[in-house]
């Protein structure tokens, strides 16, 4: 019996000594350090333990990654009580290296330091950081080494750095404040609030992404909140500025496929302020409602607006814009674009446009169309004594080929008494110059008409070729012969063979 007890005590002593040598001696600490490295680096060597000193009541630990990221832990450590009071310093050179630990693709550098205190069931972490050049404080509570709560408060963070950190383009620059509370990091669960005042738009990037032409300095205020749950974020975003107001409520971002779906409302109170962006003056206001869908290879924006007494519906798919105007007033459209009010109608318009090449096709069908009194109607009256403003056109078709700022158009209008056609008429919106040839027929009077010069004050000229003159003379004679008195007189003259011969020769000379 004594032999058994001695053996048991010896084994226990050997076990204690072995545990002591492994845990609390330099030789044993090297074994533990090697084990930690193998556990962290199962396939390739990424992190190496530079210092590992574990004693009865203290710990001194330093690990370094291949990119020179470092982790330092130093302070009180009790293995028996399973309690710690450690100070830490973490310097991460690139968050992208931790993609296996964090479900969101973060990037950039971060430095943080603080204190870890407590025991296995209640471990409290308090720290500070300069993430995105901010003044950030955070608190975390771990239960059995699993995150049960994380709160974060960041002030004066640089928005460009923050957007870079979360792998988003630098749409703007500002100083922002951020408050966040999370109950889990994997999966991400919690709530976040972000605000920014007097933020400055990155014109170059916005122009590149949305194919715009921003020139002026644009300042805005931003309010954003997100709820994270089930590998997605549900967000509310409000942006206000002197130029535009934007709201996206209940937008959804799926982390697994990096996809955004956002219903939005866009308000532009004064379209005149867009002149420097689109190089053209506008009037009035605009409200758009629609949806935004964005993923790494897709940008889809759809929208609807009630305007010009009708409706606009459009879809932007990457660089391709398709728009439809339904039952709009052309008179209000001309007023919107500061064009001369020479024509009124109800129009349906379809637009296919490439935002990169700035080329496309515009097709329009007009009904209840009518010319208004202007220099064009005055010119037609001067040559035909016909008031075209009294005509109603229900068969009007327009097709325009768009190339940059130049429109090459085919236009046809038809009424019971008139017919007007333009083939390959040129309108340059940049120079405001036009060059068009119109084929016209008014009360059987056939002629060509040249429209040239400034679109706001064009010049008109009449062109009569030999065929047109013949047609008009023939029609004139037909109208003359409808007069009974003249017809009887001609019948009497034609009884004289000599006069008849002379008249025939004269008519042949005309035709």
Predicted regions and their residues:
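Amphipathic hydrophobic-ligand
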Residues: 45-47, 64-74, 101-114, 130-139, ...
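Flexible, solvent-exposed coil segments and beta strand-coil junctions
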Residues: 64, 92-96, 107, 117-121, ...
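Transmembrane beta-strands of outer-membrane beta-barrel pores
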Residues: 92-94, 131-133, 156-158, 196-200, ...
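Terminal hydrophobic membrane-targeting helix
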Residues: 16-89, 93, 97, 118
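A glycine-rich beta-turn/hairpin centered on an aromatic-Pro dipeptide
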Residues: 362-391, 397-399
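Extended terminal
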Residues: 1-13, 17, 42, 50, ...
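Transmembrane beta-strands of outer-membrane beta-barrel proteins
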Residues: 86, 125, 150, 190-192, ...
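Acidic/polar residues at beta-strand termini and the immediately following turn/coil
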Residues: 78, 117, 143-144, 183, ...
């Amino acid at each position: 019996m004594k032999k058994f007890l001695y053996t048991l005590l010896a084994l226990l002593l050997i076990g204690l000594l072995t545990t002591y040598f492994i845990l609390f001696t330099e030789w044993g600490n090297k074994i533990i350090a090697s084990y930690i490295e193998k556990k962290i680096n199962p396939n390739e060597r990424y992190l190496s333990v530079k210092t590992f000193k574990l004693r009865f009541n203290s710990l001194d630990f330093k690990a370094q990654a291949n990119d020179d990221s470092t982790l330092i832990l130093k302070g009180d450590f009790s293995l028996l009580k399973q309690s710690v009071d450690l100070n830490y310093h973490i310097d991460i050179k690139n968050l992208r290296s931790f993609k296996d630990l964090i479900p969101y693709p973060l990037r950039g550098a971060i430095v943080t330091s603080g204190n870890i205190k407590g025991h296995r069931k209640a471990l409290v972490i308090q720290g500070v950081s300069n993430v995105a050049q901010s003044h950030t404080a955070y608190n975390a509570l771990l239960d059995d080494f699993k995150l049960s709560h994380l709160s974060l408060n960041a002030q004066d963070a640089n928005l460009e750095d923050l957007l870079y950190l979360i792998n988003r383009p630098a749409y703007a620059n500002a100083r922002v404040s951020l408050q966040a509370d999370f109950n889990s990091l994997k999966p991400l669960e919690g709530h976040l609030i972000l605000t920014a005042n007097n933020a400055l738009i990155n014109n170059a990037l916005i122009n590149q992404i949305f194919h715009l032409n921003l020139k002026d300095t644009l300042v805005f205020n931003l309010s954003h909140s997100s709820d994270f749950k089930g590998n997605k974020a549900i967000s509310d975003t409000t942006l206000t500025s002197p130029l535009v107001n934007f709201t996206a409520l209940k937008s959804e971002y799926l982390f697994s496929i990096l996809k955004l779906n956002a219903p939005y409302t866009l308000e532009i109170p004064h379209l005149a302020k867009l002149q420097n962006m689109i190089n053209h003056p506008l009037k009035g206001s605009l409200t758009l409602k629609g949806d935004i869908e964005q993923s790494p290879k897709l940008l889809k924006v759809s929208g609807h607006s009630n305007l010009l007494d009708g409706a606009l519906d459009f879809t932007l798919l990457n660089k391709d814009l398709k728009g439809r105007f339904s039952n709009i007033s052309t008179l209000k459209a001309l007023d919107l674009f500061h064009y001369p009010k020479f024509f009124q109608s109800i129009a349906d318009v379809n637009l296919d446009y490439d935002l990169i090449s700035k080329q496309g096709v515009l097709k329009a069908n007009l009904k209840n169309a009518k010319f208004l009194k202007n220099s064009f109607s005055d010119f037609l009256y001067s040559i035909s004594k016909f008031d075209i403003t009294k005509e109603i056109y229900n068969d009007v078709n327009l097709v325009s080929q768009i190339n940059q700022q130049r429109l090459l158009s085919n236009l046809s209008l038809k009424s019971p008494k008139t017919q007007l056609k333009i083939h390959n008429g040129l309108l340059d919106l940049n120079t405001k110059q036009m060059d068009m040839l119109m084929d016209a027929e008014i009360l059987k009077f056939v002629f060509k008409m040249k429209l040239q010069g400034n679109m706001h004050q064009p010049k008109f000229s009449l062109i009569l070729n030999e065929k047109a003159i013949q047609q008009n003379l023939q029609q004139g004679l037909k109208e003359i012969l409808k007069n009974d008195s003249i017809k009887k007189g001609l019948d009497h003259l034609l009884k004289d063979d000599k006069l008849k011969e002379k008249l025939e020769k004269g008519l042949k000379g005309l035709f």
